């Protein structure tokens, strides 16, 4: 019989209804994951490039792309938009996962969430979150 060993492992969940730059994309545990990633040390980045004349180390520099280089210039184009909506009333969010808006504001509805709530995206702010279904009028 094989001997069982206990090793630490990390399970990561993603909520793809939120864009990657939104904290809820990584779930409520995003801060815990960030702390774990900061403690993680990957020795491969400290090794020198083999076959290189100079002894520069590989670094993990982040690369940012200009929005103009992107195939889509419309932020909501990466989402599956079910319908456009117009806010009938002002809504002040009570929780971090809710999206606030003002009367007349246009939103993109991404999906239904739970009874009476929709998941919406606001092109103007680039944010997404839950909105009360009775506060918006869907444009079909």
Curated annotation (Swiss-Prot):
A GO term from the CC aspect: endoplasmic reticulum
Biological process terms in GO annotation: intracellular signal transduction
SUPFAM superfamilies: SH3-domain
Domain SH3, chain residue ranges per copy: 80-140
Modified how: Phosphorylated in vivo. In vitro, phosphorylated by shk1.
Keywords: Phosphoprotein, SH3 domain
Highest taxon listed in the record's lineage: Eukaryota
GO molecular function: protein kinase activator activity; protein kinase binding
Pfam families: SH3_1
Subunit structure, interactors included: Interacts with N-terminal regulatory domain of shk1 via SH3 domain.
Purpose: Stimulates catalytic function of the p21-activated kinase homolog shk1.
Protein name as it appears in the record: Shk1 kinase-binding protein 5
Source organism of this protein record: Schizosaccharomyces pombe (strain 972 / ATCC 24843) (Fission yeast)
Taxonomic classification: Eukaryota, Fungi, Dikarya, Ascomycota, Taphrinomycotina
